[in-house]
Every structure is written in structure tokens, then in C-alpha cells.
Amino acid sequence: NNYCKIKCRSGIHTLCKFGISTKPNCGKNVVKASGLTKAEKLEILKQHNEFRQKVARGLETRGKPGPQPPAKSMNTLVWNDELAQIAQVWAGQCDYGHDVCRNTAKYSVGQNIAENGSTAASFASVSNMVQMWADEVKNYQYGSTKNKLIEVGHYTQMVWAKTKEIGCGSIKYIENGWHRHYLVCNYGPAGNIGNEPIYERK
């Protein structure tokens, strides 16, 4: 497939390595749900855009210190099925972590991941998992060089002003009695680029 032609310094493209099928590849784990429902997709998109607007308007009071400054401009994200397919193929490997290459012919692609495990017979909702990313704003100091990506990187990708598109994948499975929900969201163009600001302040 053409994804084998997309080169990343870090390794082979996810869809070159695993193919384009979104069928789960989870070994002995019992898969309960693979892929997002239409409602979950809409929820993820709505949650991202509402949060981006909140930050852009200067209404986010949290931070280190808060509040976060308003933004000069912030793209409204739209759903992209290609980004979602790449995310779904990766989520379907049931292997928590970032894949090494997920770019498209159009742009480099950023990624947020979350996993929730519970011994209760239920799975965490996508909105709870996206909220965990947004909540990292409490550790973020705008304009500082001391922010650590490990503490704020999900937040900064969520509100990266120049990102235009998002596509996500999800798998819910049972592993040794644990109900695990693994969510992967891909973003294009990628955020968290070098020393670029997450957005220009107003």
C-alpha cells in the first residue's frame, strides 16, 4: 500500500506495518468493542472544539499559574476519516503507547493516547478520557520553557492553534479481568513542534 512510501525518521508507518484493516489484533484478550460509535466521534469533536474555544477566549482559569491567555486565532477542528483509520489500526493492536509513524501525504500527524482500566464491569467513556488530556492545563505555564511534555503534552496538542483535523480510534477489551478502554486520537497538522508557541496570544 502507499503508506509504505511515507517515511518517518522514527520508523515504519503503522498502516505499512499492520495493513489497512481495522480488525483488532489483541491476542488472547476479549474484545468487547472495536471502533468509535457515531455518537462518540461527535462527542470527541465537540469536546475538543468547546475546550479550544474556552482557552482561545481566555476563559480557562487553571494553570501554573492560571489563567491561560486568550488566543489571536484557533482553528475549529474537523473530523478526518484517514486520521481515524490510522488511529483505529493502531488502537486495534492493544499495545499501549505511541506508534512510530502515522503521517499522511498531506501533513505530519500528532497523537494523544489514553488508557483506562477498571475491575468494575464497565468501560470509561471517551469524554472522561479526553477530559484527562484537557485537565493537564493545570500544569501549564504559557510562554515558559520549563513546561514538561510528559505533564502537559496532551493539553498542548488539544489546543494547538494550527491543527485543523482530528481522527480517533478506540478499543474496549478485557485483559485478565480488567476492563480496558484504549483511545487514540491523531491530529493534523501535528502540534508540539519544537519551540513554537501553542497559539499566539491576543
Swiss-Prot record:
Residues 46-187 form the SCP domain. Disulfide bonds join 4-16, 8-101, 26-94, 168-185. Keywords: Allergen, Disulfide bond, Secreted. It comes from the Eukaryota. Expressed by the venom gland. The keyword Transcription regulation does not apply. GO terms for cellular component: extracellular region. The lineage of its organism: Eukaryota, Metazoa, Ecdysozoa, Arthropoda, Hexapoda. Belongs to the CRISP family. Venom allergen 5-like subfamily. Coiled coil: none annotated. This is Venom allergen 5. It is found in: Secreted.
